[in-house]
From Swiss-Prot:
Keyword annotations from UniProtKB, A to Z: Acyltransferase, Transferase
Xref: NCBIfam families: AcCoA-C-Actrans
Single GO MF descriptor: acetyl-CoA C-acyltransferase activity
Protein name: Putative acetyl-CoA C-acetyltransferase VraB
Misc remark: May contribute to vancomycin resistance.
Native source organism of the sequence: Staphylococcus aureus (strain Mu50 / ATCC 700699)
Domain of life: Bacteria
Any one of the GO CC terms: cytoplasm
EC id: 2.3.1.-
CDD domains xrefs: thiolase
Amino acid sequence: MNQAVIVAAKRTAFGKYGGTLKHLEPEQLLKPLFQHFKEKYPEVISKIDDVVLGNVVGNGGNIARKALLEAGLKDSIPGVTIDRQCGSGLESVQYACRMIQAGAGKVYIAGGVESTSRAPWKIKRPHSVYETALPEFYERASFAPEMSDPSMIQGAENVAKMYDVSRELQDEFAYRSHQLTAENVKNGNISQEILPITVKGEIFNTDESLKSHIPKDNFGRFKPVIKGGTVTAANSCMKNDGAVLLLIMEKDMAYELGFEHGLLFKDGVTVGVDSNFPGIGPVPAISNLLKRNQLTIENIEVIEINEAFSAQVVACQQALNISNTQLNIWGGALASGHPYGASGAQLVTRLFYMFDKETMIASMGIGGGLGNAALFTRF
């Protein structure tokens, strides 16, 4: 079986909903990343077999194809857009790696993009062609049958209650995320991930959701979103805009082209869980991944779990017995933001730049009751 390696990874800084990137469509968010790869790796871009991108709430059409054409890549390069909800970016990386393993191609660009600010309004079509009632707008499509389709906030509350994750633990984890993110912005770790872009004449190179200046005590002052609950705006991620791209190729070709380090894809697992508890998906996904590869949690140096809500990450940490020295050691989405279709690719990008780590996992809890996890080693 061929081996797939990730040899380059970049992302935009993540804008908050209605923030600096609010006027950019998904293909426009991706354009500078494609152009960066095109300029830096011209001998590789000409060999691309496919572009695979994750997206959830985009503007329609095949965004992967639209984006590569918008960026001036060759007409002969195909593109495919994947929707596994907020796991789409991680799914796109695994898809490209699996295609290489299977011998279907040797060079892929994978990643994800989301503009929550430019997400189209959705209107349900009336049953009658003579409908006179006003259109009914809705926030999102359903993830599961009506009785098992909680809002993401309610899903987080369900997890918090079932796994006994207190408000205090949630706030403490959120504070940790902001502090670790700020620390790794300051020391330059996170800046490695980000490609600065020019937006309306200004350089944009910093995630807008980070609030490192908020004192720890302030997290406890936020009111629960649902009366009587524990999930608040402070211990939940924000809606965000942003894009991520990774260059993935067959290992022997990577060496031939002069790439000397990166991530080797080892395996990936996707599982289903009760859709009322979507955030707990990483638990069986990571457990199955470890078992299949004859590993234990102690064998993994770093585990990146997407921080949609403190409640679900803390529950996963406790259930899997993950130490603080393993989990989200540069912070996470509670601070940096969660551009849905890009977030999974962002987790892998973060692992890519942890050059001193050898064995790593990226994992997502996904709306509709899914869990996804991927195993990487350094090459």
